[in-house]
């Protein structure tokens, strides 16, 4: 029982210290999503450590849309130590075969940060370390697309089928839907894949117009759109 109490106190203490540290600074990524033009040799995203005295071990990798680690990408450096008040650049290089030329391909970039521990200050005590995993969408975009990504949300077609909202996305771009709401019922965020039909679960009995927003290439939320569900 005492061991559990000590562990709980240790967790609470760590969270308080961690919250204080993050108030003074933190680890930040230079984007919330990455657009990788298919003809580019590489793309990059910066990572900044604004802490004044804390170092972090940073580990990065890319997964496919199924959550499996993707070997067709190289990230340099894949593992490094982020020093206090420093900025580093993660370079992303696609080395795989050509992908679909008529639509975007989706991947996920993962960045895990682990705070360093001063072993000399521990004096044999146990310390709970909390790693933070940040995930962002990576879109590999074909260069020959004629459509504009900013126009993709306006091409979406919505209809209702029982307890589902059918979403048809005729564009070649992934469209991230946020702040979805039917009537007064709020729904979870969703993503409409390019050139396919998808469905969004809808609680039974919900009536009203569909309101939603989207996220553009820069990670900004667009104005509210409103459509009727036929």
Curated annotation (Swiss-Prot):
**What is the top-level taxon of the source organism?**
Bacteria
Q: Per UniProt, what is one GO molecular function of this protein? A: protein folding chaperone
The coiled-coil regions, if any, are: none
Q: Which coarse location class describes where this protein primarily resides?
A: periplasm
Which is one Gene Ontology cellular component term of this protein?
outer membrane-bounded periplasmic space
A Pfam family that the UniProt record links to this protein: PapD_C
Which SUPFAM superfamilies does the entry mention? PapD-like (SSF49354), Periplasmic chaperone C-domain (SSF49584)
Q: What happens when the gene is disrupted?
A: Deletion of the operon under classical laboratory conditions does not result in any major effect on E.coli capacity to form biofilms compared with the wild-type strain.
In its UniProt record, which GO terms are filed under biological process?
Answer: cell wall organization; chaperone-mediated protein folding
- What keywords would UniProt list here? Chaperone, Fimbrium biogenesis, Immunoglobulin domain, Periplasm, Signal
What does the record say about induction? Expression is negatively regulated by H-NS and subjected to cAMP receptor protein (CRP)-mediated catabolite repression.
What family classification does the UniProt entry report for this protein? Belongs to the periplasmic pilus chaperone family.
Query: This chain belongs to which protein, by name?
Result: Probable fimbrial chaperone SfmC
Species this protein is from: Escherichia coli (strain K12)
Gene designation:
sfmC
